[in-house]
Amino acid sequence: QLRTTGSYPLTSVWIMITGERSYERVVAAAEVAPDDYILKPFSSQALFDRMQSAFTRKRFLKPAHLHLMNGREDLAIATMDELVGKATTPVQKLDVLRLLAETHLALEHYNEASKCYSEILDLRVIPWAKMGLARIFKAQDKVAESSELLQDIINEAPHYTDAYDTLAHNLARCGQFAESLEVLEKAVALSPRNFRRLCLTGESALNAGDPAKAAQYLEKAVRIGRNNSAFGPDVLIDLLQAHSEAGNAEKMDQVANELNGILKGEHNVFLLHVCRAMTLLGRKSWMDAQESLKQAAALLLQRQLSWRSGVRFLEAVARLPDDIDGYQGYDWVKQLSLRLVRTHQDVEQLTSMAKKSIILIRAVHDAYGFLQNTNDEAVSLTKDKK
């Protein structure tokens, strides 16, 4: 977690002590490439030698690291371009190319990052380098190419759980929630105490229409994650939804009470209305739930509305009977879709979450059609001016 969040300096050295004898399995277990690793049992001299080697490699990269730590990515990239030519060993070259690729990827320089990862793979076939290419495809909305490469990674390095997460995300983007859940469950079996992955699996089970299974994963996430820095209201909101859909009234009320003490401030008013609606839906109080969703719908144009918050709203609306008095599901979901939809994958994902409601699916498609027509008209006007 410290490594992925950047919570300690790039100049720090991370050495894994492990019983694994395959470098790829070490990398897979760590989900990112360590600076070095040493096998158990080992002597103090062996550890000293490995540490000395790791510090030598870090000193070689220090000029680039310092620029990155000062926020000067441009100078860091120029420095790394020079260091590639100065590398005297394959290991030094691989270290520079890895840092250069990660920097380009963070800056969304996808072509440059892709060239670096490809050059790394020419030196050595390493799972994290393939993972970098898969992330580039994902960022470019090339879902099929990304998924194909991720499946290759999983076949070659079945313990590389990060690849499972990204593949599951790709499947969910295409509305394939059952398949996404299946992939995540395999990853959880490999790393059963990973808080973030348990949350993702619970969310995926909700999207796949299995609230009982979602509750199991989310309850475990809450048990082991309360002291995790990433712990927050999101996992509790998903757990509330799971209990609501599964009809677990007592547990639903317990989670709702906890959320009422957490969701404070104007920026959380939308979620409070949605959570209240979830609780009322769990009791089948349709009219009261609709009123809460109506209050949430009035806030759909808020700038801070996130994709996940919007999806929670959609999933709650999809549980309302469409024949109750004053039903406005179509209007609400169309307005939501106008806010969230950008690509065809967005349409597939939202329509899959509409729980087979013909009215709501039509609302998503109508919004996408309106956006496409507006875009076509804008392009036409631009061409006319030329």
Language-model segments: which ranges?
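Short amphipathic alpha-helix used as the core "switch/output" element in two-component signaling
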Residues: 1-9
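Alpha4 helix (beta4-alpha4-beta5 surface) of REC/receiver domains from two-component response regulators
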Residues: 8-11, 20-36
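Charged, alpha-helical scaffolding/interaction elements associated with membrane systems
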Residues: 32, 69-70, 107, 174, ...
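Alpha-helical segment of the N-proximal tetratricopeptide repeat
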Residues: 59-108, 115, 132, 377-385
